[in-house]
Each structure stands twice: as structure tokens, then as C-alpha cells.
Amino acid sequence: MAAMIPGELLPEPGELELNAGRPVTTVLVANTGDRPVQVGSHFHFAEANAALRFDREAARGQRLDIAAGTAIRFEPGDERQVQLVPFSGARRVVGFNAQINGDL
């Protein structure tokens, strides 16, 4: 067997389901701005760029249902549905755009 490369992942065969069993909220998002907007996997989606139009109350306490370390990019004029999952753990949101800075 060859030596492992630093950072290399060796997953088992088959598919992995991210956030298995977590409730999912689907929201329609439109970029009304004139520049692309990128939102990362663990950003509190309700606090995303103001140029994104969507139901922010439905997104409160949630993040994108995508792999950690990845992001979704919304080009100007784009409109698409995204899936969100609730933050877990202590459910404390601090930073981002400072709209909550505390417990959810």
C-alpha cells in the first residue's frame, strides 16, 4: 500500500448523507444586487448579504445544507432554491452581521 498523502481522505465506498435526519427548510433566494454574493456553509443564512431576497425569518438559526468548507455563489439576477438546516450544539450565534449575538 502506498503512503498516505497528508490531508488525504479515504472514504468508504458508497454515498454519504450530510446532516442525516436533520429538519430541512427550503427557501427561494434571489440576488437583487449587481455583484455576485457567496455564502459559506456555516454562515448564519438569515444574516447573509442584504442584496439577497428571501424569507429571513424562515432562515433564522439556520445554515446552508452543504458540505463544510464549501459555499454557494449567487450571481446578479440569479434566483434559486436552497436547503437550510438548523445550527446545532449550543445554538448560539455570535458575529456574522451582529444581528443576534446570542442564543437563538
UniProtKB/Swiss-Prot annotation:
Catalytic activity: urea + 2 H2O + H(+) = hydrogencarbonate + 2 NH4(+)
Subunit-level organization: Heterotrimer of UreA (gamma), UreB (beta) and UreC (alpha) subunits. Three heterotrimers associate to form the active enzyme.
Gene, per the UniProt record: ureB
An annotated GO cellular component: urease complex
Annotated InterPro entries: Urease_beta-like (IPR002019), Urease_betasu_sf (IPR036461), Urease_subunit (IPR050069)
Coiled-coil region list: none
Bilayer-crossing regions: none
Protein name: Urease subunit beta
Keyword field: Cytoplasm, Hydrolase
GO biological process, one term: urea catabolic process
Pfam families assigned: Urease_beta
Record Gene3D superfamilies: Urease, beta subunit
Pathway named in the protein's UniProt entry: Nitrogen metabolism; urea degradation; CO(2) and NH(3) from urea (urease route): step 1/1
EC code(s) of this entry: 3.5.1.5
SUPFAM superfamilies per record: Urease, beta-subunit
Lineage top rank: taxon: Bacteria
Compartment annotation: Cytoplasm
Organism: Synechococcus sp. (strain RCC307)
Top-level EC class as recorded in UniProt: hydrolase
MF annotations from Gene Ontology: urease activity
Family: Belongs to the urease beta subunit family.
The UniProt record lists the keyword Metal-binding: no
